[in-house]
Amino acid sequence: MMKRVRVVLVAMTLASSVAISAEPYTVKNGNQVDGQTLQGWKTWRALACERCHGAEQEGLVGPPLVESLKKISKDEFHELMMKGRPEKGMPNFEASDMVQKNWEGLYAYLKGRSDGKIVAGRLVPLDQKVAQP
């Protein structure tokens, strides 16, 4: 009986660690992404975030997000998006329906860029066929 309990506990621990370490995005060929990540990219574009953070998230007057997303958690990102950093010129997006609905996709997109898995430029849905050169 104790052996069975240990096996179940080990299995549960392994299963939870896999879920925790899973990427928040799915990407193929650098620019084909899952629907949530694609919506995050569209949110990035609609909000014109590149004006401060650069077209490739390299930073301009705002910090380089390809570096920042290596250091902050998803929860910290959410708090930052909602509250902003007014003292540094970062607006809050608490009143933005678009951000309220798509902040997780925006996080997934930026995390994928930060991880080097998603390339800069136009993204397409995972199921869209992409012409190979």
Q: Residue locations for each model-derived region?
A:
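Gly/Gly-Pro-rich "capping" loops immediately C-terminal to redox-active cysteine motifs
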Residues: 31-42, 51-92
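Processing junctions and N-termini across compartments
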Residues: 15, 43-46
